[in-house]
Structures are given as C-alpha cells and as structure tokens.
Amino acid sequence: MKHIAIKENHLYSKAYAKGQKFVSRNTVVYVLKDLKSEKLMRANPMKEYVNRIGLTVSKKLGGAVVRNRVKRILREGLRQTENEMNLKKGYLIVIVARASIVDASSIHIKKELTKAFTSLRMIEQ
C-alpha cells in the first residue's frame, strides 16, 4: 500500500516529544496516534484508516547518494514488515536512521522494524 508521507515539521516534533520510542542498532522508531486519521479516512477512497510515515536521514550519514540509498532500504524494510504483519492503522510512524545503517541490508532493517513494532504493540491480533 502506498504510504501517506508526513510533510509538516510540527508532526515530526510531536512524534519526537509525545510518541512511544524504540531504539535499535540501525534505527529509532517513534509511534504516535494520529489525530487527523479520521479526516484522512473519509478522504480515502477505500474508507479505511491509514498510517502516515516519515523517514529521517541526517546529512551526517553521507552525501545525497548515500542518504537516498538509506531511504530506499528503510522503505523496503517497512514494506516487507507490513506485508508480513498486520499493523494497526491511524498512527504517525517516524523512522530515524542511525549511522550504522549505511552498512545494513533491508533484511536487517526488516528484522529491526518487526522487533520495534512488536515492542510498541503495533500488531493487530
């Protein structure tokens, strides 16, 4: 499923300040209930709740090529995790890349995201 990107800076700040956090070797995952999800559900043609996803990759990690590769790896790990697990809908999810992610593969990221979402109770039964 195509994600709705978080574009407003205040939503990132809110997720950092009030969201639940899971720290792992390559990523930090923040999760916060999205208050605008009701409005987005009505606008969505399929009339279901959606998660809004934000990826944060610092310039400290490297040049544009490296940062874009890291974002592709994060998106792929998230896609694989969502295909395997039934994530709860209606949340803001912010994934922050750490320095060690440059050498990681999407398989490692998928394992970390699975562990993070399980720990944050984001899996629907």
What are these regions (language model features)?
Residues 1-125:
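Positively charged, solvent-exposed patches that mediate nucleic-acid binding
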